[in-house]
Amino acid sequence: MLDKFCNSTFWNSSLLDSPEADLPLCFEQTVLVWIPLIFLWLLAPWQLFHVYRSRTKRSPITKFYLAKQVLVGCLLILAVIELILVLTENSGQATIPAVRYTNPILYLVTWLLVLLIQHSRQSCVQKNSWFLSLFWILSILCGTFQFQTLIRTLLRDSNSNLAYSCLFFISYGFQILILILSAFSEKDNSSKNPSVTASFLSKISFSWYDSVVLKGYKRPLTLEDVWDIDEEFKAKTIVSRFEVHMAKELKKARKAFQKRQQKKSQKNSRLQGLNKNQSQSQDVLVLEETKKKNKKSGTTKDFPKSWLVKTIFKTFYMVLLKSFLLKLVYDLLTFLNPQLLKLLITFVSDPNSYAWLGYIFAILLFAVALIQSICLQTYFHMCFNLGMCVGTTVMATVYKKALTISNLAKRQYTIGETVNLMSVDAQKLMDVTNFIHLVWSSVLQIVLSIYFLWVELGPSVLAGVGVMVLLIPVNGILATKNRNIQFKNMKYKDKRLRIMNEILSGMKILKYFAWEPSFKDQVHNLRKKELKNLRTFAYMQSVVMFLLYLTPVLVSVTTFSVYVLVDSNNILDAEKAFTSITLFNILRFPMSMLPNVISAMLQASVSVDRLEKYLSGDDLDTSAIQRDPNFDKAVQFSEASFTWDRNLEPTIRNVNLDIMPGQLVAVVGTVGSGKSSLMSAMLGEMENVHGHITIKGTTAYVPQQSWIQNGTIKDNILFGAEFDERRYQRVLEACALLPDLEILPGGDLAEIGEKGINLSGGQKQRISLARASYQNSDIYILDDPLSAVDAHVGKHIFNKVLGPNGLLNGKTRLLVTHSLHFLPQVDEIVVVENGTILEKGSYSSLLAKKGVFAKNLKMFVKHTDSEGEVTVNDGSEEDDDDDSGLISSIEEFPEDSISLTLKRENSLHRTLSRSSRSSGRRLKSLKNSLKAQNGKTPKEEEVVKGQKLIKKEFMETGKVKFSIYLKYLQAIGWCSIVGIIFAYVLNSVAFIGSNLWLSAWTSDSNTYNGTNYPASQRDLRIGIFGVLGLAQGLTVLVASFWSASGCAHASNILHKQLLNNILRAPMSFFNTTPIGRIVNRFAGDISTVDDTLPQSLRSWMMCFLAIISTLIMICMATPVFAVIIIPLAIIYVAVQVFYVATSRQLRRLDSVTRSPIYSHFTETVSGLPVIRAFEHQQRFLKQNEIGIDTNQKCVSSWITSNRWLAFRLELVGNLVVFSSALMMVIYRDTLSGDVVGFVLSNALNITQTLNWLVRMTSETETNIVAVERITEYIKVENEAPWVTDKRPPAGWPHKGEIQFSNYQVRYRPELDLVLKGINCDIKSMEKIGVVGRTGAGKSSLTNCLFRILEAAGGHITIDGIDIASIGLHDLRGKLTIIPQDPVLFSGSLRMNLDPFNNYSDEEIWRALELAHLKSFVAGLQHGLSREVSEAEDNLSIGQRQLLCLGRALLRKSKILVLDEATAAVDLETDHLIQTTIRNEFSHCTVITIAHRLHTIMDSDKIMVLDNGNIVEYGSPEELLESAGPFSLMAKESGIENVNNTAFWAAAARDAGAGRLSPGFASVT
């Protein structure tokens, strides 16, 4: 039929037998013309529909668009001309074939369609159509045959159809021009990422990334150089898609979980029924015990399962499908190579075959390899981006869950464990996603390999398959063991990171008590277990590697042996051998990768379980908190009962309470009565038992322990709200922050560090209050905000913020307070006891009622006046039953004596006192400066010296220094390195030997052609080939074992050095370095050194030697190939140099941008109640998304850089294959089939090996960055040695005499002095009180005594010994401190008291008795073994402070420092601590940093500090008599003489004798 259509022959059946490759003209004019046209017309409707759906605003006409349209227009004109020529041809000639009419008409219509498509693309972001590019490529390729036919026809006959030929040549040229134009992309200003607008050719070759690589080569890349990720990869887009499917799948999983629970319940019921009339069986007891343990630990083995993987699949199924198709095409094309190799060997072996066939085979080899490269790299790009998306999804979802998780579920996880979910577990899922298709792909490749091997060798291949099958269960057993080891290791890692988190959080306490060695041992012990598992895992992996490496060798040896042994006529020739070897090489990859993928999947399954358990945990149930904007009351409790744990009794019980809008309500009660729980219930932080709470309007919350974000003071106060300068200034003034801003460098733009590390407790609390005040909410929940400020500041804040005339006047305020003198000014008082409301009413009504509140209040006033210490009302309180004077009495009490839970706060004490005459002028000046600052934020270079407390994370640039590699190699050990290299070299020798031996074996087919093959020769060939194969496996096993041992040793050394150095770093390092940044070294970087780096080093060594071996073998066969290697090597090296510079820096950027994600997460978890109260979850989610997107743009860029490199390397590899094949064709007369097979079978491997080599080079350099980052912290400057040769005498200090001589100190070299020439003598057993405002130098004095700060000048001597001359532990171990913040660590109570086990149980119990904790600890279930949780939430602040007192009592050193030790405790606890100190430390030198003047009035001497100088120093009597700063402070506190302070002793006696009821400490 087609013959008639063309009037010529359609197909020539003897084409392959002709000396010239010439397709029939009819075939060229029909099939080769129609293929591209059919492709275009089939896809055009779908393309136009897609354009219609995704169209955006039409872009302006560009030169590219015009050029392409003009060229297509020219093609249209040429088609018209051709049609006219056909129609006007001489009718006298022979009949014109139909094809001459149809082709121009088809082209005419097609070019019109192309014009339409190109025009429609102008309304899309992507102007170039990928399918149009494919059409042009197909059209040009198909036209090539017609092009060469016309050329040859014209050369034979110059007048043959010249016009038609010219039209074709012009059309062909235009098509090439259009394809060239299509390779360039038209820029779109709406897109920041060029990948969005990149052309098809640019995308498949990753050429759009060239500019980044060039930039990275010229200079180190910065974050600004990296393009933003495309919208589809952003966290918000991905998570929104993920959550839709997650909701459905989680719902199904929960139903399945409930069914499992019901079945278990029924089974247990039956079990109990069987044992009803018998004593409980052992099994039931064990079951019950297990339940108890699970309940206690907060963990359950069962939870909603198997939903996460389904959700991920449903979210990303399109990417999975596309990547599946690409991998399928790649795998199928892989099996064309052995067939082409076979054809080439046949071609060389047959001297009669035509040369053009050889060239066609060589070109086909190159074409197949090129298509494979495009498919593989696009596949990898998709999969790695998918992995990145999965990682993004996990991190964002875990963060979002953390914002909604219930408190009960949250308690099951430490912060370290949750961070691990975001880092380690997310990474495991990313890794497995990258190679998920290898599961089915490996199976497909194995099956196809076996099939093609059967075709070559027949049933003999079954012997090889049998070997593979036998090894499957072995690999399965090893994989299972590896999973268990991995699971254990994750637990050890979690524990280690938890301890590290605590160490870093409580570093100052460790240094004060010289406890670093104890905690170092704890970490080392866990690390030993971790490394033991790591070694076992590495050894198991070595065995797996050995089996994987040996399997293809065993299979090939077995198969070849059986093939030649079963039939004497079976002789192994080059065709069979090298085709089979190529198939065995194909088989090697899936065989080696499948167990790795299975192992990765097993590891990922552990992570999936952990993530499913966390993400399926219960959310905070706020259904009991009803918000009604039209409600007539501000807050209403209706029969409300709430609990922290449903397994425990309710903490808040049957509360009925109405609070009207605008009221100021004080909540008072005993310690542990439920005041804070009542506030938490209102915030929805507790589990509802029954009843509900109705709230009208928005809430703001000030927690008891202030939560400060790492940022500026201004950011903390604004808390995401719009900046209103007038309100902002009012808030600063009302919260008494203006004087503090004057002290701080940079004012409100000063960075205040992680957790507000460089602020006092009072400053943090006032910033917390300012944050709430600025928000302009309807209801303010204030949990004891005045506890951290002194009396004058408290009064100022109450009057200016909380009180009737304060900033929040008109707002509803619930105030938990311990300050009696404010109670008369509140609208209502709520008295809480044991979770219930005892009384409620106004101050006067409660007094009139004469209930618990009035009774305790009168008792307080009576005992105060009975001693005659405080005279406030001229005898108006004589009648005990008369309440009329109580209001005035309470109002006129000296605040310093009534405020029962005060914390250090002297900054405003000074600035608000009468001694500050210039206060007004300074405040005005500061306001003006703040206005200037808020109007225009200073640039970074304008920031005041010392303003930026948190240093920007240091990032190396350029090549990783050789010293880093050297450090790692030294850590491995030079003996191990030599052994590893030697083993791998032997492996390469065995590899070359086995190939040469196989080549010699196949040449036997020529030697013994037609004759009997000697059995001895056959056996020799088999034996040596088998020995060489076994040698390859054994050398890999030895190298892997040696490497595993050496790398584990290196990991141990680096971790040990890092830990030792971090523990020895000065406090200034921790003050300027966020904890998350340090933890990242112990988590991510150590994990890289443990797992990834050893693997990449091993792979690099194997790839490098494999390439050298292959090139040696090719050059041995064809020496001329050495000439081609040189230019290819230059290209290879150039590409690598360009790539490595970029990749290395991108990896560094990845590390630097990852730390803030974890820091932000840790910060969020610690401030959850505040974030929820302000309803700022969405803002924090957005911040997290921005952080993730910033990190992921570095990851995405790194992924693209890998693909950019791989494509170019594979191109080099493909050129090696093409060059080798070309050489075989050119020199076929001098080569034999076995040489061709030998060369090409190895050349086919080089593409993949080259790719892996550069990837491993990059991976190694990328991963060695972890060693670089660890080394950075190993090199951190240490504080002084813990122990020196000069040690103090035994029993030192025996007196406790301290002398400061012209002592000067500064916090950091670039900062000013904080102590400026301190001179004073403290005699033995003296009691010294130290006072002064914030910034005066009080805490600095303490830090100097412990050498937390080192002297900038002068010296301190204790008992005649200069403390700078002895070791830090010799010094700190002999001093004792009770710090302001009572820090405890996870572990037992005993460990917290005595981490070194230096004391007996009797001594510890005695210390607890003196600390008034014996009965409490004895009453605990496990006594001294009772575990303290990470957040210390199972002990009150008072109990923690008493434990700190217990530490001091155990030490019983001659010098005791009280750094505002009773600042955060109530009167009872304060009294207990003060009494114990007076009794037990009477023979010691005691230095007290004062928060209340009354506590230091019985001191021998008072030291008044101001601006780093001692302004007064003398006995209290002397200082009160002089008209100095201390005298003014005392008068303001109501102290006129030393005897005035007897109030405290009286109150203490009453409380101790039981004459004061517990309410005394609570009506506060």
From Swiss-Prot:
Topology versus the membrane: Multi-pass membrane protein
Cytoplasmic topological segments:
49-68, 115-126, 187-311, 380-435, 481-542, 607-969, 1053-1095, 1139-1209, 1254-1543
Q: Give the UniProt keywords, A-Z.
A: ATP-binding, Cell membrane, Glycoprotein, Lipid transport, Membrane, Nucleotide-binding, Phosphoprotein, Repeat, Translocase, Transmembrane, Transmembrane helix, Transport
Q: Catalysed reaction per UniProt?
A: an S-substituted glutathione(in) + ATP + H2O = an S-substituted glutathione(out) + ADP + phosphate + H(+); ATP + H2O + xenobioticSide 1 = ADP + phosphate + xenobioticSide 2; taurolithocholate 3-sulfate(in) + ATP + H2O = taurolithocholate 3-sulfate(out) + ADP + phosphate + H(+); leukotriene C4(in) + ATP + H2O = leukotriene C4(out) + ADP + phosphate + H(+)
Query: Which residues are modified by glycosylation?
Result: 7, 12, 1009
Q: Where is the composition biased (Basic residues)?
A: 258-267
- Which residue stretches are annotated as topological domain Extracellular? 1-27, 90-93, 148-165, 333-358, 457-459, 564-585, 991-1031, 1117, 1231-1232
List all Low complexity biased stretches: 909-918
Entry GO MF terms: ABC-type glutathione S-conjugate transporter activity; ABC-type xenobiotic transporter activity; ATP binding; ATP hydrolysis activity; ATPase-coupled transmembrane transporter activity
Gene3D superfamilies (UniProt xref) = ABC transporter type 1, transmembrane domain, P-loop containing nucleotide triphosphate hydrolases
Biological process, per Gene Ontology: bile acid and bile salt transport; leukotriene transport
Would the keyword Membrane be found if you checked this record's keyword annotation? yes
Residues bearing Phosphoserine are 279, 281, 876, 925, 929, 1436
Q: Where are the transmembrane segments?
A: 28-48, 69-89, 94-114, 127-147, 166-186, 312-332, 359-379, 436-456, 460-480, 543-563, 586-606, 970-990, 1032-1052, 1096-1116, 1118-1138, 1210-1230, 1233-1253
Binding residue positions for ATP 2: 1332-1339
Q: Where is the ABC transporter domain?
A: 635-859, 1298-1532
Every ABC transmembrane type-1 domain range:
320-603, 977-1262
Query: EC number(s) on record?
Result: 7.6.2.-, 7.6.2.2, 7.6.2.3
Q: Which family does it belong to?
A: Belongs to the ABC transporter superfamily. ABCC family. Conjugate transporter (TC 3.A.1.208) subfamily.
Name assigned to this protein: ATP-binding cassette sub-family C member 2
Q: Which gene encodes it?
A: ABCC2
